[in-house]
């Protein structure tokens, strides 16, 4: 039961991270682009 709770939390965390990952990558690329210019 503890393993099921852990896998559920990790699944939600991974889904949250994957859903917000493109925004973070886009922001970091945009920030580095402005710093280069």
UniProtKB/Swiss-Prot annotation:
Highest taxon, organism lineage: Eukaryota
Instruction: Tell me the protein's name.
Output: Uncharacterized protein YGR204C-A
């Amino acid at each position: 039961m503890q393993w099921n709770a852990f896998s559920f939390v990790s699944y939600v965390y991974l889904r949250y991270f994957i859903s917000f990952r493109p925004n973070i990558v886009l922001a970091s690329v945009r920030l580095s682009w402005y710093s280069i210019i």
